[in-house]
From Swiss-Prot:
InterPro entries: ApaG_domain, ApaG_sf, Uncharacterised_ApaG. It comes from Brucella suis biovar 1 (strain 1330). GO terms for biological process: error-free translesion synthesis. Residues 3-127 form the ApaG domain. This is Protein ApaG.
Length: 130
């Protein structure tokens, strides 16, 4: 698992290879990832948008921006957590993802929190990208 804390908000990511959905002979590799966001701060916050930077083993970069996550813009009270799962296809057997969430505090001010960098690796070809 990979974890980062920004302003008392912890983001943990657990990636996993989806062998059943992958077709290596067609250069199609698919991973899922489970994200848990825990609000350890003293204020209620809302997740407004997301930004991902996805880099494959050949150095090709894809950027993904969007409103909320999985169709939601969750509100997290102090001590609350939110979890969701999503996926990422690549044309290489490894890659790395990193990103950030745009959050809104109780006063309406927006701020960014870090999504930790995490590697996407085919289990039998495990390697880490920095």
């Amino acid at each position: 698992m990979y974890s980062a804390v920004t302003r008392g908000i912890e983001v943990t990511v657990e990636p996993f290879y989806l062998e059943v959905q992958s077709e290596p002979e067609e250069n199609r590799y698919v991973w899922g990832y489970r994200v848990t966001i825990v609000n350890n701060s003293s204020e209620t916050v809302q997740l407004c948008s997301r930004y991902w930077q996805i880099t494959d083993a050949n150095g090709h970069v894809q950027e993904v921006r969007g409103s909320g996550v999985v169709g939601e813009q969750p509100v997290l009270d102090p001590g609350a957590s939110y979890q969701y799962s999503s996926g990422c296809p690549l044309t290489t057997s490894s890659g790395v993802m990193v990103g950030r969430y745009q959050m809104k505090g109780e006063d309406g001010a927006q701020f960014e929190i870090e999504i930790p960098a995490f590697s996407l690796d085919v289990p039998e070809q495990r390697r880490t990208l920095n």
